[in-house]
Amino acid sequence: MQDHEKFVMEILKKDKDELLKEIKVSHEDSMGADLGQENLEPIKSLAHQIYDLYQLRKLQEGYISTLMDGLCPNIKTVCGALLAAKLIEHAGSLKRLSEMPASTVQILGAEKALFRHMRTGAKPPRHGIIINHPLISKAPEKMHGKVARSLADKIAIAAKVDYFQGKFIGDKLKEELEKKFG
């Protein structure tokens, strides 16, 4: 299974026999031992706790998304609510993020690697936390730096517009990025 949340739901809803039938594996061919009821209860309890954490995460993401709609809609549109919140956190405030050049926005979150580069001459970081953006994730490894530079540029523009309460240009910025790298 690819999705951890779905896996937890399957554990909560079905027993071992149902799961084996679903994936078309016989009881003899399956790995592992049969668990007694006393061992199954802690596993199910843990699965419930994990499920509750997933639900809490969704709730928090919804809250952050709503908050970002009001505070900085352009940054949210360009990079998503969670990444926008992390960038503002690393910068210290929306004001500080808006004052940063794109090159600094690009390596936010990679300060340790930057100082290692300055101290020892190691390779400089190409990106910080913006590596989590889908455009960078989908790009080939050798294009990560180029995509990160363009993305940081658009984020820096969006931050300036949001801080100085200009008009909404997030869609235009995102469209430019998708046209170039999408």
Which residues does each PLM region occupy?
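DEDD superfamily 3′-5′ metal-dependent exonuclease/proofreading module
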Residues: V8-E10, D34-Q37, A47, Y51-Y54, ...
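Extended compositionally biased segments used for macromolecular assembly or nucleic-acid engagement
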Residues: M1-L35, P42
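Long, well-ordered mid-to-C-terminal structural blocks that present hydrophobic/aromatic surfaces
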Residues: S65-L97, A102-V105
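Long, highly charged low-complexity segments enriched in Glu/Asp and Lys/Arg with interspersed Ser/Thr
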Residues: G166-G182
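Intrinsically disordered or highly flexible coil/loop and linker segments, enriched in small
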Residues: L59, V161-F168
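Phosphate-backbone recognition surface of nucleic-acid-processing proteins
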Residues: E89-Y163
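Helix-hairpin-helix/helix-loop-helix acidic hairpins
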Residues: E28-L82
